[in-house]
Design a protein with these regions (language model features):
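Short acidic (Asp/Glu) and glycine-rich catalytic loops that position anionic groups and cofactors
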Residues: 18-22, 103-109, 151-160
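Conserved anion/nucleotide-ligand pocket segment
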Residues: 19-91
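Glycine-rich, aromatic-lined ligand/substrate-binding cores of catalytic
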Residues: 61-64, 69-141, 145
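Glycine-rich, charge-decorated loop segments at or immediately adjacent to ligand/cofactor-binding or catalytic sites
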Residues: 3-19
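Sec-exported extracytoplasmic/periplasmic mature domains
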Residues: 8, 44-48, 182
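Short, surface-exposed recognition loops or helix-turn segments adjacent to catalytic cores
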Residues: 2-8, 55-60
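Conserved functional hotspot residues or short segments at active or partner-binding sites
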Residues: 115-218
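A short, terminal or domain-edge coil/loop segment
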Residues: 52-64, 108-116, 192-204
């Protein structure tokens, strides 16, 4: 099943002419709402793979179900997605991987924390909560990563609490957080350089569209 339900679709469509990569390969929205089987059927038919594919349908699953509703144990897909709750907030905070803002790696709650040494926690929490985004609350948080960005340094930031998974708009939350931080802390915020010269940066690959990269004005 889709771990963050199959009922909600959000985000811009990936521009494959400019930003196709291992991050995103086909022109789909960031939060696509599909199951693994549905993705396989889509890729196979619409994008010319045309293999002999057989998908075993799930029993008793409906699109509005959260992973925890299935009663299945959470199997960690990657060390930095330790819980089902993390998979929800990942859609909102993974964009910071390509910036000099910490996305919480090096802590026990990766992707649920966002911060940097030059951010004032209480100030950022107050500002983000003022947007009244549905299903989320930003708690002021100081933390010190043990590895990754700012290892051993005290970071100010926020803990992203999802208060209602049914109304939480992960991608909208992502763009609001990004816009506010890159505007409020313009003297410090930076997009990391590309890993390969002449190629797009990780930030650009994750954003996937010039509409997001260059039109973050409101």
């Amino acid at each position: 099943p889709n771990p963050i339900n199959g009922a909600i679709v959000e985000g811009n469509k990936l521009d494959i002419e400019k930003y196709r990569s291992f991050v995103g390969y086909y022109p789909m929205p960031q939060r696509h709402g599909l199951t693994m089987g549905e993705l396989a059927l889509l890729f196979n038919k619409e994008y010319g793979i045309n293999c002999k594919l057989h998908v075993i349908p799930m029993l008793n699953w409906t699109r509005d179900m959260d992973f925890e509703d299935t009663g299945l144990p959470w199997v960690i897909p990657t060390p930095n997605l330790p819980t089902n709750a993390t998979s929800y907030v990942y859609n909102a905070t993974c964009i910071f991987e390509g910036t000099n803002v910490s996305e919480g790696r090096g802590t026990t709650t990766p992707f649920e924390l966002v911060g940097a040494p030059w951010i004032k926690s209480e100030e950022l929490s107050r500002d983000l909560n003022a947007y009244n985004l549905p299903g989320v609350f930003f708690r002021p948080q100081y933390y010190t990563p043990t590895f990754s960005k700012y290892a051993g340094e005290l970071c100010g930031g926020v803990y992203v609490h999802i208060t209602d998974r049914k109304t939480f708009e992960a991608v909208k939350t992502s763009w609001v957080m990004l816009y506010h931080i890159r505007t409020k802390y313009a003297d410090n915020f930076k997009i990391n350089k590309p890993y390969v010269e002449g190629r797009p940066s990780l930030f650009e690959f994750e954003a996937g569209s010039d509409d997001v990269i260059y039109n973050q004005t409101s």
